[in-house]
């Protein structure tokens, strides 16, 4: 399976969460012809190193793409991919960095799409869980959600959440953690993402409650 990222697709806008190293393949397979914005969860390579694939959309539209990052991710991207942000003789800047706020929203076809950002722990760094229209939460890399933030995750329609492996890991939720979490916040459906290659899709599916499913490449949520 490819490294995880997500696309929020509305009628006229495509908004990415993260730029995985497999982004080009993911965009082609999903027939995505434009990207309007990118929101990052954190700075690790498996969520950022497809950033150069955004160049195609800049060249197509001749318009910088807005990205939204926390401070650590901003620093990492500027240091590692400075040519995407600063003008030089060889490459035009393709991205405009923006500071991540607690709440963002944008309009498409008269409808407002809202994103709430919640800081979660991912081992010894912070990662971001995004809550979209108060219906879907996306937390691709998480080892702890703070108690004060659980109320923002109550009774969701969908919870898309990190499940690296069956047993304890210091930087990621495992299956035991998730089953305890969903008893507390009661999402209607939970989708497990960021699954390690050691987890077989059919094997884990047999172990899960009916309202919990493993994600797969090109998973769609309506």
Task: Tell where the protein language model's regions lie, with residue ranges.
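Active-site neighborhood of divalent metal-dependent phosphoester bond hydrolases
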Residues: 61-65, 73-97
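Glycine-rich nucleotide phosphate-binding loop and flanking beta-alpha elements
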Residues: 23, 46, 75, 167, ...
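Active-site neighborhood of phospho(di)ester-bond hydrolases with catalytic His/Asp-centered motifs
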Residues: 16-20, 36-46, 69-70, 136-142, ...
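Structured loop/turn residues at beta-strand edges in well-structured enzyme cores
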Residues: 33, 93, 111-113, 154, ...
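Binuclear metal-ion centers of metallo-dependent hydrolases, dominated by the metallo-beta-lactamase
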Residues: 146-221
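Core dinuclear metal-dependent hydrolase active-site scaffold
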Residues: 1-30, 96-148, 217-221
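Active-site metal-binding motif and surrounding structural segment of the metallo-beta-lactamase
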Residues: 14-69, 155-157
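Short, glycine/charged-enriched secondary-structure capping and boundary segments
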Residues: 30-32, 52-56, 81-84, 130-131, ...
